[in-house]
Each structure stands twice: as structure tokens, then as C-alpha cells.
């Protein structure tokens, strides 16, 4: 089981790990621990580099299950690697992710509209909401409310919960339940 370092420290930029498995078919490796986010929920995966035996190797993708797809030759099981995230990309994705949570929170709080879809990229994103009738005037109104929330500089709290427990918190789930 891979220790998911990004769950406890989203600001971690580098880490040391050991190769636990090699996937020849996808040119990927599994590690005992990782700070690379594999993507999910509309958020792209992290990319970056591994330093393996003094050589820099590009991490092009991280898949579910934390399979790190790399360029070049695969190391053997037991090899020590140093992971280095593309921090500029990660930080921009973090900011975008947070902004989308603020958008979702404002729309839920003030209009009781659930999220029906979405996607994000670096400093851009899209969220679909279940509005009975979306009016153009609402766009500026929502933006103004979001800016008030950003200006409030609220503390952000992260909690990793089992799925079943998260579903028991009514104000936490703002996505159409059939999409989860």
C-alpha cells in the first residue's frame, strides 16, 4: 500500500521513496510513498521528475492506484528514488481547486444548486450546476459573492474521511449523488 503524502502535506515538493513494483506494459512504477497526486474528480494528475541513481527521469503521468508513468528505463524493485513535483503546476492546480470549492460553496449556500459536472486545468476550470433557469445577471452576482469570500481570508481545513462517513454530513456533499 502506497503512503499518500499529498493527503497530509499538500505543500510537499520533494520526497524519498522505494520502488515496490514495476509495470513493463505501461512503463510505470509503484512506490512505497508518493507526493504525486494521481488525478481524479476532474483534477489533473501531478507531473515532475524522479532522480534515480543520479539520473533525472520525467514522470509524465500518475494513474489511479499511484502508478507513476515515466520516460526511459524502468528501475528494479528496491531502488531508491527522489521524487520532485513540478511545483509551479501543482501550486496553480491547488489554487484552482480551492477556487472551485469556493464557487461550489457560494452557489450551494445562496442558490441551493448542486454540482452536476466539472473539470479543471491549470488556472482554469468549469463547473456545471443544477439551476432551474440560469440567468446572465447571476454570473456577476456570484462572482461578487466569491470575491467577498476570498477577501475574508478564511482558514482552510482538510479532513480525509471514509466515503460512507462523508455522505453522512449533509452540507459536505454538494454534488449530485449519482455522480459520486
List each model region and its residues.
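A glycine- and charged-residue-rich anion-binding loop/surface
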Residues: 1-180
